[in-house]
Amino acid sequence: RYQRTLERAANWLAGMQSKNGGFAAFDINNTYHYLNEIPFADHGALIDPPTSDVTARCIGFLGKYGKQAHQNAVYRGVSFLLREQEANGAWFGRWGTNYIYGTWSVLEAMQLAKQDMKHTAVRRAVQWLKSVQREDGGWGESNDSYLDPKLAELETSTAFQTAWALLGLMAAGEVKSESVRRGINYLLSAQSSNHLWEEPWFTAPGFPRVFYLRYHGYSKFF
């Protein structure tokens, strides 16, 4: 019933792929970094380069859709993601703070695109997520990590960042791992009396290093 709609969406999405294999939020091949040197371009927002998290969303859909016509786009997108992986195994997150968000996004995309989840890049990402799990079983990351990646740790765990980490680990085949068990226990213990999760943190970047938003649904949806 929805086949034609899905086909049109997939074709349009594949057409938004940039030359380097990645996908951006709004534009194609908008990578002219010299534009950010224009006076008063203090947000660094005159370009829209491909990012790991947006690419992951697009590749996840195209991989799940699974049509042969889009396999080259999936291959190029996965290649982009592998090139973008940080030295510590994480991926940068443009639209959610930060490395936890980006790493979850890519791991889930890899699984949806039917990639080998034993790939070295995947295992490195898993090890990074496990390495930043907090003593209480949760995960947390502050916006300071946009200033210095070494600061990718919050003074407290958050429900939605814990959920991101868990989704990433489970996509990578870690469902029965001790890290996942501890993370789920944290979420159960952090549930409020109204049976939801409440978080005060502003962890949705408008422009990284400039300003951040708070999406009230994050802690409830994820």
What are the roles of these predicted feature ranges?
Residues R1-F222:
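Preference for long, amphipathic alpha-helical scaffolds in soluble/luminal domains
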